[in-house]
């Protein structure tokens, strides 16, 4: 992950910098973080994902901690981490859920710390495919995917500065690719923010 490698290059010395992976799933970003010299922590609401993450950490002898926790209520003290990452978790839920998750990431991030968050763009093919629950929020009705029935919130470019307004610096770019025989556009925001 480009963000982790770039961040590690900016940090002085071999100190174990604490990194939190919110929505860690099977722990793939924790593995890379550990290889780069971070002290990784991961949280997820999926016990299956956490079980896979624990097994991966044991197989690679990586010293890492994982815990069951919601992205909207993290079990850590303020300013606990040098870096926070969340790849594709914050958009599951309403606008309020996304705002709470971003606020929690900010809360646990140390002053000068950096975060990397991947959010869905309103240009994504999933946008508008399902029951509308609010502005840019839908219960997806796409059959044949593991996202059927999930609630997702999408952002336009002009929304990002407001959602990340508590951060001192915010940069974002769009990443797009196609799947399903090049018929389905995936469109995500790659957001880096500094406290």
Positions of predicted regions on the chain:
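Conserved catalytic-core motifs of eukaryotic protein kinase domains, centered on the activation segment
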Residues: 95-97, 128
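A short beta-strand submotif of the Rossmann-like class I SAM-dependent methyltransferase core
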Residues: 86-89
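A short glycine-rich, Lys/Arg-flanked "PGG" loop and its adjoining helix->strand segment in the class I
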Residues: 99-111
